Amino acid sequence: MFQDNPLLAQLKQQLHSQTPRAEGVVKATEKGFGFLEVDAQKSYFIPPPQMKKVMHGDRIIAVIHSEKERESAEPEELVEPFLTRFVGKVQGKNDRLAIVPDHPLLKDAIPCRAARGLNHEFKEGDWAVAEMRRHPLKGDRSFYAELTQYITFGDDHFVPWWVTLARHNLEKEAPDGVATEMLDEGLVREDLTALDFVTIDSASTEDMDDALFAKALPDGKLQLIVAIADPTAWIAEGSKLDKAAKIRAFTNYLPGFNIPMLPRELSDDLCSLRANEVRPVLACRMTLSADGTIEDNIEFFAATIESKAKLVYDQVSDWLENTGDWQPESEAIAEQVRLLAQICQRRGEWRHNHALVFKDRPDYRFILGEKGEVLDIVAEPRRIANRIVEEAMIAANICAARVLRDKLGFGIYNVHMGFDPANADALAALLKTHGLHVDAEEVLTLDGFCKLRRELDAQPTGFLDSRIRRFQSFAEISTEPGPHFGLGLEAYATWTSPIRKYGDMINHRLLKAVIKGETATRPQDEITVQMAERRRLNRMAERDVGDWLYARFLKDKAGTDTRFAAEIVDISRGGMRVRLVDNGAIAFIPAPFLHAVRDELVCSQENGTVQIKGETAYKVTDVIDVTIAEVRMETRSIIARPVA
């Protein structure tokens, strides 16, 4: 009777269109209920039965119900699922398998089965890659996943590495392939094998891609030749090895080991500038005036060199600081170290006066046992030898940026535009409240940015610096020359790490075209997109492995009185994030640990402060003492507590 009633259909349509709806992202809680977050201000309650239809992170459209002045959301339509491809731990066995996603807010096991053709018999505790196949909001009865890749067994000591690489879909090993002979590139190579080139690296480094030679000139000037390993002498553009390097884009450096961009035979041997081995290089000869200015007679050329010594950062630093018992093996090498230290001093002063110098942060190194256990984590401060290499590389990259810009008009450039113009007024207003007056227009120029950075560096603490960081734009990779505000330079193009950065290989090929006087093809913009994406994934992988190892390292400190100095790096509504000064671990201090009475506590991300009873008790960049309250291995999170 009512089946085809057009009035009824119209009424249903009307009711549907009049029912309020909202689109947002599902946020799960540990208590079974959840929230639909529409924006920063508005969220709706999702009752536990309705949460069964969705997953934390899903973007959905929901119907909004109002009962007794309480609004709740009923999920109706899936816009974008949170989980598509993911890693997790397998539960059950044989024909009844489920997988728990490796994510702090996803606790429920998802029924699953192995994909066809995947011949691994999954067991309880195995790690796997899975892909979602069913979702209740897509008309399916329940969630369902398919196991697409076996990662490793549950007790594997190297789980942090294998799981992280699988999560980000990154390669686990060096690329295959060999290069048997050098290409005929039509380059005339200068024979510099008689010169006392040296490399300075960590003791364990095998892929040495830069060697340095310095010479004093009669008029108080200094000459520097930077010689860089030459993988493009072996790898033709468009070849199989080139395509593999293009996809990887970078060598992936993880705690404990690296996954090279090039086959190890090339990265650690044929291209590596080993001591007492003749190697082809691409080189840059520059003259530095007394104040460290790079003069205009920059020269790029192909050469062969023979490094005369593999020097180690700490030994060189000790010797220059008159400590330790290491001595250069000859007076010629000693003279090189002295001259390179002079160049470092001059270039450091030039950058301090005319560009920007980063504050030195220590590097943290994990010392691992054979089974991946963390024996120690050591902070390695950046010392004089590190700065020698850094100044030489920055100078060489400035030279490449100039030559590529003037001769070709393109290359692979690192570009950083400073502050986002949309933030300029807010930035000026914030600085004004702290007594610094800047012009919103001027601060968007390179000179204005440098001026502000110098003022911030002169502040007694880094608090204000941390406040304005959110107004900065991100560094980008571009085929167009452009300024690098972060370094305070008009243009910056790297070519000094071609064994581990594909962009540097591209710049090598472009510089070789300049040397030969040939025309060159502008790199396609897609390559910069791939490089930016790979850089992001590699950084996330390094962070994820690090989090896992930090959790392992600090697990036995949980609940003890062991104190750690910790710098506050971020404050949010829920508490504070801190970095342990001695080892670099990130820990979280929940708000209740800061003060028991919630109403008397204000944690402000906006101001970077924690106020208790209206008084500022903590602020970002403060260093405080903490103990480790808890280490949660399943989420690799470290919970700390301030020492009262």
Swiss-Prot record:
Cellular localisation: Cytoplasm
Residue ranges annotated for the S1 motif domain, each copy included: 561-643
For this protein, the record's InterPro entries field holds: CSD, NA-bd_OB-fold, RNase_B_OB_dom, RNase_II, RNase_II/R, RNase_II/R_CS, RNase_II/RNase_R, RNR_Ribonuclease
Q: Which Pfam families match?
A: OB_RNB (PF08206), RNB (PF00773), S1 (PF00575)
Functional note? Involved in mRNA degradation. Hydrolyzes single-stranded polyribonucleotides processively in the 3' to 5' direction.
Cited SUPFAM superfamilies: Nucleic acid-binding proteins
Identify the NCBIfam families for this entry.
3_prime_RNase, PRK05054.1, RNase_B
Q: Does the keyword rRNA processing apply?
A: no
Q: What are the protein's GO molecular function terms?
A: exoribonuclease II activity; RNA binding
Residues of the RNB domain = 189-516
Cellular component terms, GO, for this chain's entry? cytosol
Q: Which domain of life is it from?
A: Bacteria
- Under which main EC class is this enzyme filed? hydrolase
Q: Which family does it belong to?
A: Belongs to the RNR ribonuclease family. RNase II subfamily.
What catalytic activity is recorded?
A: Exonucleolytic cleavage in the 3'- to 5'-direction to yield nucleoside 5'-phosphates
Question: Which UniProt keywords are listed?
Answer: Cytoplasm, Exonuclease, Hydrolase, Nuclease, RNA-binding
Kindly provide the name given to this protein in its UniProt entry.
Exoribonuclease 2
Record keyword Coiled coil present: no
Tell me, what is an example of a GO biological process annotation in this record?
mRNA catabolic process
- Major site of localization recorded for this protein: cytoplasm
Give the Enzyme Commission number.
Answer: 3.1.13.1
